[in-house]
């Protein structure tokens, strides 16, 4: 190709587009992407977990001896049954390595799963020592309306690193 061909091609192109004016672009607003069902369910679950569990609430719990709590109106025999290990937990939640916000969500999900599966007893492992979760989990459990009682787990279910939790399923016959 030489310069004459370039000039000739350019002239031909100019002749072809002569009289054409650019299209005026109107602004197009695209919808924000729709949230998936999982995102919506997770957000709803977080909202419910935050409404049940407050970090500032300080219930009266035992300082010495095994960690235990019994809701008003629940027979004290239930606490004794939990202590002896008469109830076998159907679901187990291990909170080792979780942050507080994640642990709250998992705890709320565990209680919801117990209700859904008609499981009266579950085990929550929070770990040994005097860590944050060991202090917070009993305080959160006291606040949930579906929790009837909890007691430090027997050795076979984690001992002082875990709690056996009794869930209120309504008027169902007791399962052991």
From Swiss-Prot:
Database matches in Pfam families: Smr (PF01713)
Source superkingdom: Bacteria
GO BP annotations listed: rescue of stalled ribosome
Coiled coil: none
Keyword match rRNA-binding: yes
Smr domain residues: 93-168
EC number: 3.1.-.-
InterPro entries reported in the protein's UniProt record: Smr_dom, Smr_dom_sf, SmrB-like
Keyword tags: Endonuclease, Hydrolase, Nuclease, RNA-binding, rRNA-binding
Any one Gene Ontology molecular-function term assigned to this protein's record: RNA endonuclease activity
Oligomeric and partner information: Associates with collided ribosomes, but not with correctly translating polysomes.
Family indicated by similarity: Belongs to the SmrB family.
Function noted in UniProt: Acts as a ribosome collision sensor. Detects stalled/collided disomes (pairs of ribosomes where the leading ribosome is stalled and a second ribosome has collided with it) and endonucleolytically cleaves mRNA at the 5' boundary of the stalled ribosome. Stalled/collided disomes form a new interface (primarily via the 30S subunits) that binds SmrB. Cleaved mRNA becomes available for tmRNA ligation, leading to ribosomal subunit dissociation and rescue of stalled ribosomes.
Protein name: Ribosome rescue factor SmrB
Source organism per UniProt: Shewanella sp. (strain W3-18-1)
Upper classification of the organism: Bacteria, Pseudomonadati, Pseudomonadota, Gammaproteobacteria, Alteromonadales
